[in-house]
């Protein structure tokens, strides 16, 4: 906690092995809670060396653990202190040095930017997305967490795979998403922890948009990777039906990660990565009885990573 820059200062002082050990332990907990695929972002290094360190750890985690992992370069997360008086120089570093190196080493699948008042402007976000596209790294964007500044419209224009947060939405934002290929993603456990407004799930779904759900697991605003909590918050706070919430955190989240062909539904030809619950009276009981552990078994690629009574 303590903000992005505080977390970045701590991460810079950690070795790659320390970072790997801590991240591996968190992912093992998440797998036991039913997560079979995860996107891991950098963004807490804010230097070439530390951002690369984070992404190299992600590659180690991919090799060590069975769950599907996507890596995202989020160097445009906050302005580091050493560039406090020269924003353009930091953007130059990201676009001209960091993105090419990340691509050359095969360290990331996407680029991301925190496009928000007091962080990065729409024009700066567009610059990062353009640099990513030039190196075949599709964009994802943190946007509309606190204010609506036109980031969604620009993200859609640049073909971003997803726009994430969306606690503050205006009609123009919904208009931009309607008919696009960009997936809107809400992060209700972030709203819960920060005590900020929840995203307008029903407004988004009323536009027939494929709403996705995720945790936003990070040290400053969501110190939890538990998707079971997200399911309960989606139904209790976002007013989603259980079927809608489960669809959002499976099929639509897979689409937001670019994994629709592999994951998101129990379908012939896809990976056998799924959970089997303990006996429950109905689907609605899963979000209703919040805080309880309803999972019996977790399978990833057909192999139990948490074996219960049925395995």
Language-model features: where?
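Active-site metal-coordination/substrate-binding segment of hydrolases
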Residues: 1
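Active-site-adjacent C-terminal substructures of enzyme catalytic domains
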Residues: 138, 148-265, 277-279, 283, ...
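Loop/turn positions that initiate beta-strands
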Residues: 269-272
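Metal-coordinating catalytic core of metallo-dependent amide/deamination hydrolases
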Residues: 4-24, 28, 36-150
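Short aromatic-centered micro-motifs
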Residues: 298
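Non-catalytic positions within long, well-ordered alpha-helices that form the structural scaffold/packing
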Residues: 31, 95, 103-104, 133, ...
């Amino acid at each position: 906690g303590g903000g992005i820059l505080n977390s970045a200062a701590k991460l810079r002082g950690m070795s790659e092995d320390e970072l790997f050990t801590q991240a591996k332990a968190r992912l093992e907990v998440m797998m036991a809670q039913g997560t079979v695929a995860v996107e891991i972002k950098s963004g807490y290094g804010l230097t070439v060396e530390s951002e690369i360190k984070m992404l190299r750890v992600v590659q180690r985690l991919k090799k060590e653990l069975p769950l599907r992992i996507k890596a995202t370069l989020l160097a445009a997360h906050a302005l580091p202190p050493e560039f406090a008086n020269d924003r353009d120089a930091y953007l130059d570093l990201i676009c001209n040095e960091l993105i090419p190196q990340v691509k050359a080493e095969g360290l990331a699948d996407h680029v991301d930017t925190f496009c928000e008042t007091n962080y990065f402007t729409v024009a700066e976000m567009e610059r990062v997305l353009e640099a990513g596209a030039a190196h075949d790294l599709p964009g994802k964007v943190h946007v509309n967490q606190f204010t609506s500044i036109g980031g969604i419209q620009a993200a859609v224009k640049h073909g971003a795979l997803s726009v994430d947060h969306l606690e503050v939405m205006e009609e123009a934002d919904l208009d931009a998403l309607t008919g696009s290929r960009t997936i809107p993603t809400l992060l209700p456990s972030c709203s819960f922890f920060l005590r900020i407004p929840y995203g307008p799930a029903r407004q988004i779904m009323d536009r027939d948009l494929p709403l996705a759900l995720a945790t936003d697991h990070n040290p400053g605003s969501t110190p939890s990777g538990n998707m079971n909590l997200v399911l309960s918050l989606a139904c209790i706070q976002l007013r989603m039906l259980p079927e809608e919430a489960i669809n959002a955190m499976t099929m639509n989240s897979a689409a937001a990660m670019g994994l629709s062909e592999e994951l998101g539904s129990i379908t012939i030809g896809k990976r056998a990565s799924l959970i089997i619950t303990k006996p429950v009276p109905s689907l609605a009981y899963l979000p209703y009885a919040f805080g309880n552990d309803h999972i019996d078994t977790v399978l990833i690629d057909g192999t139990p990573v948490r074996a219960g009574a049925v395995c």
